Amino acid sequence: MTTQLDSLRNMTVVVADTGDIDAIKKYQPQDATTNPSLILSASALPQYAPLIDEAVAYAKAQSNDKAQQLIDAEDKLAVNIGLEILKIVPGRISTEVDARLSYDTQATVEKARKLIALYNAAGISNDRILIKIASTWQGIRAAEILEKEGINCNLTLLFSEAQARACAEAGVYLISPFVGRILDWYKANSDKKEYAPAEDPGVISVTKIYNYYKEYGYNTVVMGASFRNVGEITELAGCDRLTIAPALLKELQENSTALVRKLEYKGEVKAKPQPLTEAEFYWQHNSDAMAVEKLAEGIRKFAIDQEKLETMLSAEL
């Protein structure tokens, strides 16, 4: 029996959106993505205790300063979890920069270099890592610098066409346009509470971005993210990559209904437009209330979970 997950794999690279090693073993994705919220959830699992202990021991060996120890411990823990995942997936792990650095280009660049150095020290080459950065103007500029250094980036919390365009123009390796969080916003801010997959605002957003990239010949990979239901996933079959939570991977694996490719650009490739200026980026992005609110909210939520992780690690230091 061919499952929907099998069919999806034939047209899209399937990525696991989790830090749960058992789930990754079960669904055998090509890549895996993590974020501060997923690291926090994974850290509560008993099998991760040795990774926490090792991160704490590493931090204590680096510095006697408590504040620095905390920074080193959280960076090392994120990398330790990434290293465990890389034992299972054949492709890449996405590890996220502290969301509190989202508006600081230089600090983001420095944090990314540090995370890469930790992976390199453990014998992992750059071609197996993606550094996740929020798709702010400053984050996109940081990614532009990092890409030139051979550090590939995954630009996340992407909700607007302006963000997507700026990422492509910066030569970013991969973007993660969010689907479910866009749907959440429209449900909360309009009278319409139910959407068929084809009319889902998040699905429409990713489809537009995918077609724009192909139309203008951008090499940036489009990886749809943040799904609320299987319908959103099947409606984006054919997207370059999709990062999917274990519960939805399970649904796809248990369903054998035929899957039809929905995304495929067959038109001509056009000449690229002039890159957006900073002023144009902000005008276009800020013209979309949903994108403004969800980007800010996403950064706040990741920062809150980063702080919870720090509280947990502080007790160990």
Swiss-Prot record:
Function: Transaldolase is important for the balance of metabolites in the pentose-phosphate pathway.
HAMAP family for this protein: Transaldolase_1
Claim: Cytoplasm is one of the keywords in the record: yes
Entry similarity comment: Belongs to the transaldolase family. Type 1 subfamily.
Signal peptide: none
Annotated catalytic residues: K132
Pathway(s) served: Carbohydrate degradation; pentose phosphate pathway; D-glyceraldehyde 3-phosphate and beta-D-fructose 6-phosphate from D-ribose 5-phosphate and D-xylulose 5-phosphate (non-oxidative stage): step 2/3
Source organism of this protein record: Haemophilus influenzae (strain PittEE)
Biological processes annotated in GO: carbohydrate metabolic process; pentose-phosphate shunt
Reactions catalysed according to its record: D-sedoheptulose 7-phosphate + D-glyceraldehyde 3-phosphate = D-erythrose 4-phosphate + beta-D-fructose 6-phosphate
Gene Ontology CC, one term: cytosol
Subunit structure, as described in the record: Homodimer.
EC class of the enzyme, as a word: transferase
UniProt GO MF annotations: transaldolase activity
Enzyme Commission numbers on file: 2.2.1.2
InterPro entries (alphabetical): Aldolase_TIM, TAL/FSA, Transaldolase_1, Transaldolase_AS
Assigned keywords, A-Z: Cytoplasm, Pentose shunt, Schiff base, Transferase
Protein name, as recorded: Transaldolase
Subcellular location per the Swiss-Prot or TrEMBL entry: Cytoplasm
NCBIfam families found in the cross-reference section: PRK12346.1, talAB
The encoding gene: tal
Pfam families (alphabetical): TAL_FSA (PF00923)
